[in-house]
Amino acid sequence: MKSKVFAGIALLGAMTLAATACSGGSGGGGDDDTITVGFAQTGSESGWRSANTESMKAAFSEDEGFELIFNAADNDPAAQISAVRDFISRGVDAIVVAPIVEDGWDDVLQEASDADIPVILEDRTVTAPEDLYAAWVGLDFTKEGVMAGEWAAEAFGDTPTKMVVLEGTTGSAPANDRAEGFAQAIEGTGIETIDSQTGDFTRDGGKTVMEGFIQKYGIEGIDLLYAHNDDMALGAIEAIEAAGGVPGQDIQIVSIDAVKDGMQALIDGKINFIVECNPLLGDLAAGLVRDVLAGEDVEKTHFVEDQTFTQEQAAEVIDSRAY
């Protein structure tokens, strides 16, 4: 059953993003000390995802004692499940998955369990029974939505406010949970969702959907945009500017991720508020793989703490951030 309320521990502290590459190994070989890991990534749809991939490659590098078999599924759930089955057939020591969507994982996770290959979930969650995977490490997406919604509730209050939403990939944990958390936070305010469509977490998708919103409602008919990630917000900014509007003023924008391009847009006043979603999960995932393979008992869920940024706060930290 779906675990929406995680009872895991919050993991604090900075994580370093190193610029190392993964090996191109073909299977579960290597010397006795090398741990072979298959990593099924969602794709390369956003700046956040690219930073997450680099963090994973650095943590699972040869220098760290790993052989990494990497697959990016281009946001295709069927292709991602096929990649996991390929890892199983190769006899890897462990599998790490950033699930594109929450549903449809029961069978392949059971296959991994039958092959005695532990699976670590990274970033996103699944609805499969918890005994089919060893652990999960990632962010509290519902809390991110709540924090974004709390800013909107404070900024607009009881003022009648027309909001449009750029959703993440349909069926994905961050899209589902960020929507749920935001809705909780704005309950009882004057904010009304007049339209909500998926931009699939991509900049092009955000631009295209926002163009449709503007054509339908006009710049003057939209007060607030809630984007489930920065890349979609950045695409929406392009659409607003192309229509003659001023992002951050004519249409206020709240977004989630805090990647560098998004933070710069916040500093420039084109985004009004950003909730962080830390992509640097590699070291934590690698540590979990080692612990699980060593037979240690590990917590099922592991949260990484997020923070929020105003324009002034973004200006103070942007030069020191790794992503």
Model-predicted segments: where are they?
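A residue-level marker of the well-folded mature domains of exported/periplasmic proteins
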Residues: 2-8, 22-323
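C-terminal motif of bacterial Sec signal peptides marking the signal peptidase cleavage site
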Residues: 16-21
